[in-house]
């Protein structure tokens, strides 16, 4: 089913999740949730498929309730180990160029895994809310790819990594002055840096009778599987201090990348970054991309499998800004970070991980989140580039196991 309006999205979410939705807490200075054991929520009965889980208790509203994960569950054990290993890590510091982000308790720390079958594993501050910031960018560009096409995203915005910081004006100037293949070079960079994300908002088609903000928020809600809202404190704080982004959007207008009202595009982008989410939300949103664009909790086909694949390709290229190559080299999965402390990592066809920990490294990525995801995926085998040698083909076409020790050719080469 393809969703066409925000109102349809909200109706779907209410019907699917019912009144049994969990309560959600907003992260604030000095607040936080005490460390908790891993809990698991089974997928909705009608979406469970072939996932083998003990029967889940269900709330009166129809939403499966969390329960302790069964002993020996490999995902639960890996999640608990990753959480404990980095719980006391004190590296990094909160973003301070957006004043309100500097006040968030740096000890908040949550990890969540959501499988494509809809099982949810969570530990720590998994439901504390924070501003989504740049983690919103892949989901908006997924909607643009779905409605305007992948080609226009490549042409108007670009899909290559910039090698510069996420808000770099230098990167815009360098891209604008590349002498060759000008039809393919755009100063916006890609949809996951600020210039490209603002251009993405400008490019987003709006169905008749809807406003653009309704499309943006409704799309994020469809990915998350629940109603979301803007944190007004964050929105005001960003709006009062976003002078750098104002310069960026004026350049985008001068370069004819932004074709509408530049200040409107910037305001919509700022609102988008100010939406409140939790690590659990990010994991559900990532699992929707991992599941070919189908939300594993609501069953809604939010975007097509093709749009989800294109989106993940962009995330793999530029999700962690100038450190994306290093991340892909070490971890091997697409991931997107935000200066609010969130990270979403996606293993296509399997699961997604959502994390929340406010202290950041110099590139703007959560320090604890990166370390925890890397440790978790090492145990769960999520690296997309990892493989084992295949056996030799027999004349029948069957594969025989690879022999122990070096092959004869390798052995000869050692002599």
Question: What are these model-derived regions, one by one?
Answer:
Residues 58, 291-415:
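Structured C-terminal helix/loop/strand segments within mature extracytoplasmic catalytic/sensor domains
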Residues 67-85, 89-91, 144-272:
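Active-site-adjacent helix/loop patches that line small-molecule binding or acyl-intermediate pockets
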Residues 87-123, 344-345:
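A short, well-structured edge-of-sheet supersecondary motif
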Residues 118, 131-154, 285, 353:
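Active-site SXXK
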Residues 138-144, 248, 276-295, 347-358:
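Active-site-proximal alpha-helical segments within enzyme catalytic domains
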